Amino acid sequence: MRHFLSLNELTKDEILYLVDLACRLKSEVKRGFFFPYLKHKALGLIFTKASTRTRVSFEVGINQLGGYSLYLSKNDLQLGRGETIEDTAKVLSRYLDLIVIRTYAQSEVEEFAKYSSIPVINGLTDDYHPTQIIADFQTIFEEKGRLKDLKIAYIGDGNNVAATLLVGASKLGLDIAVATPKGYEIKKEVVDFAKDEAKRSGSNLIFTDNPKEAVKDADVVYTDTWVSMGQEEEKEKRIKDFEGYQVTQELMKLAKEDAIFLHCLPAYRGFEVTPEVIDGPQSKVFDEAENRLHAHKAIMVFVCLGRI
């Protein structure tokens, strides 16, 4: 039994294993095979943030693996009325077999895991989004046939997705260029962690405020919304601050000819990306979204059973 709270705790080999397992599980489904690796296992989903892809993919995923799910809104639990995280974790550990938490503070997920005797999976916090990045790496592997000798360019807000992508790339030895406006950089402690990983893996890390510099000769161009959940009051300011950071056809032309475009969704066309890019032939965003299902299954199997 283990938790899945961020990519920081995973080794390169474990990340590659999860990608491989996700591909295998996807192949099984495509061939009509559903193996009950988690037969009769109960998955609890505790969400305080809205969700489309994370919730649906985990619920469908545990079903495909032979288990079942319970959606537990924070307001439906005594947790929403002041019961401690410690007590909630200890009680739910007696009923469930694994838990996915989607909330604001990373500290809440870590505290829950501290007192839980069953695996806890981080379904998204303000700091990290590790389940998403496993699906991203799966998509890149499917498109490029490898997870080495590649350059990723991330354009936009240095948010939870950017931070996790940076950590993952630095562990795998992938080059990554991050272009953010001043004031929206990835947190220093995450950058420092990635730099240490890059020394071991050979990753080339570039941090700039120039999207054109970041995208030059990239194999993958990635962006995310400029206004994340909980930042709605900052919308007008953020739209102004991110002027020039939109992924356009012109920007994509600076990447390699066979570069792919990724976005974790939801996307806001006309803001962080133009319709021509996200709906164009280089876009793999819906393959990426589909892979959330199989990546999440791989993560659930991994935390419950280890390697299979």
Swiss-Prot record:
Carbamoyl phosphate binds at S51, T52, R53, T54, Q78, R102, H129, P130, T131, Q132, C264, L265, R292. InterPro entries: Asp/Orn_carbamoyltranf_P-bd (IPR006132), Asp/Orn_carbamoylTrfase (IPR006130), Asp/Orn_carbamoylTrfase_sf (IPR036901), Asp_carbamoyltransf_Asp/Orn-bd (IPR006131), Orn/put_carbamltrans (IPR002292), OTCase_ArgI (IPR024904). Pathway: Amino-acid biosynthesis; L-arginine biosynthesis; L-arginine from L-ornithine and carbamoyl phosphate: step 1/3. GO terms for molecular function: amino acid binding; ornithine carbamoyltransferase activity. The keyword Amino-acid biosynthesis applies. It is found in: Cytoplasm. GO terms for biological process: arginine biosynthetic process via ornithine; citrulline biosynthetic process; L-arginine biosynthetic process. Pfam families: OTCace (PF00185), OTCace_N (PF02729). One of its GO terms (cellular component) is cytoplasm. SUPFAM superfamilies: Aspartate/ornithine carbamoyltransferase. It is an enzyme of class 2 (transferase). Keywords: Amino-acid biosynthesis, Arginine biosynthesis, Cytoplasm, Transferase. It catalyses: carbamoyl phosphate + L-ornithine = L-citrulline + phosphate + H(+). Its EC number is 2.1.3.3. It comes from the Bacteria. L-ornithine binds at N160, D224, S228, M229. HAMAP family: OTCase (MF_01109). PANTHER family: ORNITHINE CARBAMOYLTRANSFERASE, MITOCHONDRIAL, ORNITHINE TRANSCARBAMYLASE, MITOCHONDRIAL. Belongs to the aspartate/ornithine carbamoyltransferase superfamily. OTCase family. Reversibly catalyzes the transfer of the carbamoyl group from carbamoyl phosphate (CP) to the N(epsilon) atom of ornithine (ORN) to produce L-citrulline. This is Ornithine carbamoyltransferase. It comes from Caldicellulosiruptor saccharolyticus (strain ATCC 43494 / DSM 8903 / Tp8T 6331).
